[in-house]
Amino acid sequence: MQDVKQLTVNAIRVLSAEAIQKANSGHPGLPLGAAPIGYAAFTNMTFNPKDTAFDNRDRFILSAGHGSMLDYALYYLFGFGLTKEDIMNFRQLGSKTAGHPEYGVCPGVETSTGPLGQGIANAVGMAIAEDYLANKFNKEGFPIVDHYTIALCGDGCMQEGIENEAASLAGSYFFLTWFPSLFIL
């Protein structure tokens, strides 16, 4: 008998492959290869799928937005309100599951991503905001703001100028709470 982790990773891969095949369009590499990374992130993050705007939630940014089926499979399996029909309508006009994640369209998406590297810059901005809020509101013994921002990016993201600028900015702030979870695939 396989364990729950492997079954879930396999489900992410199968859902992604089925939706991409049905749409006859999409990028299967990232959701198939990064399924274990997505599973590990989501099983260790703080979030509430019934309240996706919960202030102290951890943020997951898929910078390599072309691999959006990874996001959608995770949102489906972790109860964010997507249906199997939503998954099978991947890349269809008017669908919640567009070719790139769109903020405000699909529950759970933290920011729209498309241009490579953009998600890294968004994650750095979110981490700066988190750091500011933590310094303003946290008191000893009362960590009101203590969430994390996680960015999953591909090699294409790391080759863009926007990533270099964002990484330079992040380095200048010496983030302690924004652990650089920039997985290079």
Label the model's feature ranges.
Residues 1-12:
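N-terminal hydrophobic or amphipathic helices/low-complexity stretches enriched
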Residues 27:
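Globin-like tetrapyrrole-binding proteins
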Residues 31:
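Conserved phosphate/pyrophosphate-binding and hydrolysis machinery centered on Walker-type P-loop NTPases
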